[in-house]
């Protein structure tokens, strides 16, 4: 997700914009989830997953999830306010620097968590096995690695995008080849 948004924190989306390449995207909200315990259809967005937690795991797990999401939000705010490709530290002017500081200072006491694996946040906040497996699955989908080896900034970006009310997923029409062709152009 994030290729079709402008601005976007998706590094690939930023590179495609710098290259003036547009990719035709198929947008969708739902997907099928298969777990050993159960399988279900799910839509991205905060409420569909909260409802699924409540139905599958109960109120205590929902409270645990809400606490976890609250711990991720400050990190998402930091990551979403740092321009990945928009400007280089070498040419960041004073006003851009002040604007950046204004955006990240409210959450700066949480910034050290960005240097740890995402599993660190999970270990601090989630005990429910289903929720832990869920985050491990999302980590694998983003990085190809388990949550304890996945970059926290990448996951904070995912959580800020996937759990918004207007969230959606994207797939390039024509598959990965479409992305490769756009980059080669």
Regions found by a protein language model. Give the residues of each.
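Hydrophobic alpha-helical scaffolding
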Residues: 2-5, 108, 145, 169, ...
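Hydrophobic (often cysteine-bearing) scaffold residues that line and stabilize catalytic clefts
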Residues: 8, 114, 118, 131, ...
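Structural element of the ATP-grasp superfamily
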Residues: 16, 122, 183-184
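Short acidic-hydrophobic surface loop/beta-edge motif
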Residues: 31-35
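Rossmann-like flavin
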Residues: 36-40, 46-150
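Flexible hinge/switch segments at interdomain interfaces of large molecular machines
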Residues: 149-159
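Helical element adjacent to the flavin cofactor pocket in flavoenzyme catalytic cores
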Residues: 157-185
């Amino acid at each position: 997700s994030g290729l079709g948004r402008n601005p976007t924190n998706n590094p690939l989306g930023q590179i495609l914009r710098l290259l003036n390449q547009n990719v035709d995207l198929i947008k969708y909200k739902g997907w099928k989830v298969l777990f050993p315990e159960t399988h279900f259809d799910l839509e991205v967005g905060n409420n569909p997953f909260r409802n699924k937690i409540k139905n599958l795991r109960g109120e205590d797990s929902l409270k645990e999830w809400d606490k976890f999401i609250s711990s991720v939000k400050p990190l998402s705010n930091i990551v979403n306010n740092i321009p990945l490709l928009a400007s280089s530290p070498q040419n960041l002017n004073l006003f851009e620097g002040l604007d950046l500081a204004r955006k990240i200072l409210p959450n700066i006491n949480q910034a050290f968590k960005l240097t740890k694996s995402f599993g660190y946040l999970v270990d601090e906040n989630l005990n429910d096995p289903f929720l832990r497996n869920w985050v491990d699955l999302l980590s694998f989908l983003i990085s190809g690695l388990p949550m304890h080896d996945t970059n926290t900034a990448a996951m904070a970006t995912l959580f800020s995008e996937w759990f918004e009310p207007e969230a959606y997923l994207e797939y390039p029409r024509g598959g990965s080849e479409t992305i490769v062709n756009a980059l080669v152009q």
